[in-house]
Design a protein with these regions (language model features):
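Short amphipathic alpha-helical interaction segments
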Residues: 161-166
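Short alpha-helical segments that sit at the start of domains
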Residues: 111-141
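Generic amphipathic alpha-helical segments used as scaffolds and interaction surfaces in large
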Residues: 83, 87, 122-126, 158
Length: 166
């Protein structure tokens, strides 16, 4: 109940309102530290962070927080470990704010990627032969990161099911 009471008392517009990133970061750390469930505490903490941020702007956020944290799990767990044993959490809040900025940047880049993908398909999608279509679809599935090391001949042959002679 203490966590829920704190979360309610710090809501935007309330007497105890906190800055958005501060509230979201504290909520995340607080929930992970109390660890009320056997499983899923991290997911719930991320959801609470996103809820806190959404409340501050009055709409859902576009931040791929889970994606960024998953990609840098060791740094995330290290930051939690360093900051869950005392009341000095400035380092955690700095880490969390930087992570949120990365998550927002990733989301914006993903939106741009999807828009450009759609434009490409609208413009020339009907001109692809079957093999080209398979390769383009597979490349797009790799998302922003793309193929590690680029699209090699071996990747192309594997995707299209063709031989080198083709």
């Amino acid at each position: 109940n203490a966590f829920l009471n704190w979360f309610a008392k710090t809501t935007p517009g309330s007497e105890g309102e906190l800055p958005a990133l501060t509230r979201a970061g504290i909520a995340h750390l607080y929930f992970v530290c109390i660890h009320p469930f056997e499983d899923g505490n991290g997911r719930i903490a991320r959801a609470l962070s996103e809820k806190a941020l959404s409340q501050s702007i009055g709409q859902p956020t576009l931040a791929a927080l889970s994606r960024i944290l998953h990609g840098k799990r060791k740094a995330y767990y290290d930051a939690l470990e360093l900051n869950n044993k005392n009341n000095e959490i400035t380092d955690w809040l700095v880490y969390f704010a930087k992570t949120i900025l990365k998550a927002q940047s990733y989301s914006l880049n993903m939106i741009d990627f999807l828009i450009e993908k759609t434009k490409l398909y609208d413009r020339i999608g009907s001109q692809f032969n079957k093999r080209q279509g398979k390769v383009i679809e597979r490349m797009f599935r790799e998302g922003l990161e793309g193929f590690k090391g680029g699209l090699s001949t071996e990747n192309y042959l594997s995707i299209t099911g063709t031989s080198r002679a083709t």
